[in-house]
């Protein structure tokens, strides 16, 4: 049968967006993308998943998300199982420095040698062309969908 998931119900997937001061790299990303965010994570049942420069690539870990450094958007429409499966399948992927430069800075196609944070989150959410999303674009998209989705039918 079908289940109806309504906004405001307990969420198992969230998008966490880093707005803290961070490093010079964080500030450069925010400046280049004209966004308040320099990094993003998908939070699936309390574990943060992303591709991280600090951790060398795709990983999952439990970490604090203090409100002064992170904004969090509930994603009631997200398929937690598909997102988890994407991160499980890409757990050994390296951080995508080359793709970050090619796609985000130069607007070129990815070379497939690594994954950057917003690309990982967008791909895990099943969005088309995940390399086109920086943290700010992903935040805008997810916030829009969250505000305009009253219910989702899942079979």
Locations of regions flagged by a protein language model:
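Activation targets extended, charge/polar-rich intrinsically disordered C-terminal tails
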Residues: 100-155
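Exposed alpha-helical structural elements
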Residues: 24-27, 82-86, 137-140
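Glycine-rich catalytic cores of cysteine/serine-nucleophile enzymes that process amide/ester linkages
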Residues: 14-77, 101-111
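A structural motif
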Residues: 76-100
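Amphipathic alpha-helical interface surfaces
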Residues: 58, 79-83, 117
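Short, Lys/Arg-enriched N-terminal segments with co-localized hydrophobic residues
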Residues: 1-10
